[in-house]
Amino acid sequence: MQQRDLRRQGFFDFHHQRTGIHCRRIRHDPGAEPFSTGSKARDKARVDALATEIDKLQDLFYADRRYKLLVVLQGTDTSGKDGTIRGVFGRTSALGVHTVAWKAPTSDERAHDFLWRIHERVPGDGEVVIFNRSHYEDVLVPVVNAWITPEQTRQRYQQIN
């Protein structure tokens, strides 16, 4: 079990070695109650309050330059990722908040390790970065479409697990 836990932290360990900054993963509890209360008016009020709080926190992040936040939204097409970004982060200052929508890798990105483009876009000090989709798709899509060899697949799994 301990060895598996260490492998799961591979990305964070790599980032720590590269930058000297310790990262920690915050996981959503799948057993938690959904955000929706069943009332559109109450849900809108909750999103408004959350957006206001995020805007204030982002201002502190930007001014303090000690902390950073990476938000990764993963879901199928039409699952609400763009709407979540607009609704929750749309009212924050453009200073220090960036959204990255991952598309097919460019030829320059393909010339590097598959996580290279991910590492290039993680937040800097004082920044909030939102990933619209995750690096897991750079494993899943090529495997499903047989674009990479079984050895490349194994290597990618090792890097993200």
Locations of regions flagged by a protein language model:
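Glycine-rich phosphate-binding loop of ATP-dependent small-molecule kinases
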Residues: 4-161
